[in-house]
Regions:
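P-loop NTPase switch/coupling surface
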Residues: 1-187, 394, 417-438
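Switch/communication elements of ASCE P-loop NTPase nucleotide-binding domains
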Residues: 1-58, 244-381
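Extended hydrophobic secondary-structure segments that form protein cores and membrane-embedded regions
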Residues: 144-148, 237-239, 299-305
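Extended helical coiled-coil dimerization/tether regions that scaffold
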Residues: 173-296, 405
Length: 438
């Protein structure tokens, strides 16, 4: 599955908007309140339409609260009114079919999200469901998953009987896939089941050999951890006593280290758990792909605030890391971190600004953080107080009032220091002007 574009009407802050997507990575940026989460929620409604054709699948709906408000002034009385219909139109590819179109809409406050104009996509899903029932080994199911900002602290309350899921039939790969909050229980249960399988096999054969899919999922987590740390020879195992995932590795000084994943910092824990969840869902959806399941499973993954609790060093590589590990996945993510924005080219960025969606005019890849703040986020790279003093300094310089320019620059140096490149350049400029003026 891949999305090409979405058109939306009357969804939250958007009266009308259209966004097209890169095949691999689309980064949605904007200030807080610009509508980044609204765009991801729109996409979640769209892609989860596929789940309507899968047994046990749960699709996201358009809620009446999602309808855009208009405020009418009636002789001094403000009358807020929801605007209908709310429409989400999508074009994309799925299960070897190109340029499929489907529409979901909500036509009134008391209405339900329509599905009648999504028949082509749900028809493909129903066909896939029949293939699942008949054990078709050639069927490669798309991964669909959404990781919202609640994924770190808000755990999904599991209402299902988890014992009933220990079989992990293929459809279980879609359970809670659209829940913006985290649900690690299913992933941990899968690790537990795979670990017990390997122990059972050891009893039969006398050899301890972990299942191929388990090793593949472990590899995704270990590979990610090594890319963002100085760790070497990393391994992962499920501790049956504590019901936790544990990483063992060599640190940079060669010493052996061992940490449970849930003991790590928020950035490590959040991102490694997310990567593990993606990999485990792939393994459940497409077990016949074996050790190629990470490389060959297609799909759409949505991540709100990809930079959540990440160190800037990992912010710069997280998108390329995800694409390297899961090359057939279309990642649609949001962020306002300069270190994330300058890690991708402008063609993969969509800026949200007062209800408009557009691509940056200038190239973004490799740019310094200050220019990203200034040109993409429309934010000053310095606090307003320092910017005002710098403007005053250059105003005095233009007037050849070097005494006042020196006074203002000295005040700035007291606050910022003398090693800042811009401040050092300003001091050099002032000294040169004084020499030339003598």
């Amino acid at each position: 599955m891949k999305l090409k574009n979405i058109k939306i009407s009357n969804y939250r802050c958007f009266k009308k908007a259209e966004i097209d997507f890169d095949d691999h990575i689309t980064l949605v940026v904007g200030k807080n309140g610009a509508g980044k989460t609204a765009i991801l929620d729109t996409i979640a409604v769209s892609v989860s339409t596929f789940l309507l054709g899968i047994d046990g699948g749960v699709s996201r709906s358009i809620l009446k609260e999602d309808a855009r408000y208009e405020f009418h002034n009636l002789n001094g009385t403000i009358d807020p009114q929801h605007q209908f219909p709310v429409i989400i139109e999508t074009m994309g590819d799925c299960l070897n079919r190109s340029d499929i179109k489907w529409t979901r809409s909500l036509n009134s406050e008391s209405g339900k999200t329509t599905v009648k104009e999504a028949g082509e996509l749900t028809g493909l899903a129903k066909k896939a469901q029949n293939q699942i029932m008949t054990g078709d080994k050639s069927l490669v199911l798309p991964l669909i998953s959404y990781y919202g900002t609640g994924r770190l602290y808000s755990q999904k309350k599991e209402k299902r009987n988890l014992k009933s899921l220990t079989e992990f039939k293929r459809q279980v790969g879609y359970v809670d896939c659209m829940a913006a909050e985290s649900n690690e229980k299913l992933m941990l249960n899968w690790f537990q089941m795979q670990t017990l399988k390997s122990l059972q096999e050891q009893q039969k054969t006398g050899m301890l050999e972990r299942p191929l899919l388990l090793k593949t999922v472990e590899k995704a987590i270990c590979r990610s951890f090594e890319r963002i740390s100085d760790a070497r020879n990393t391994s992962l195992f499920f501790d049956l006593d504590t019901h936790r995932l544990v990483l063992e590795f060599e640190s940079a000084d060669g010493s052996a280290q061992k940490f449970a994943m849930d003991e790590m910092s928020d950035g490590y824990k959040n991102t490694l758990s997310m990567i593990g969840d993606i990999a485990y869902r792939m393994a459940v959806l497409n077990p016949t792909l074996g050790d190629q399941v990470l490389e060959k499973t297609p799909g759409v993954v949505l991540i709100d605030e990809i930079d959540l609790h990440l160190h800037p060093q990992w912010q710069q590589t997280i998108l390329s890391d995800l694409h390297a590990i899961f090359p057939e996945i279309q990642f649609i993510v949001s962020s306002h971190a300069p270190a994330v924005i300058n890690s991708v080219p402008r063609e993969q960025i969509r800026i949200l600004d007062h209800g408009e969606i557009y691509m940056p005019a200038a190239q973004t890849y490799g740019r310094d953080a200050n220019s990203i703040l200034r040109e993409v986020m429309n934010v000053s790279e310095r606090p307003a107080e320092i910017k005002q003093r710098m403007d005053l300094f250059y105003a005095y310089m233009d007037e050849n009032n070097y005494k006042e320019a020196d006074r203002v620059l000295t005040e700035i140096e007291t606050i910022v220091g003398t090693t800042d490149p811009d401040i050092a350049a300003a001091r050099t400029s002032l000294d040169l002007e004084r020499i030339l003026g003598e």
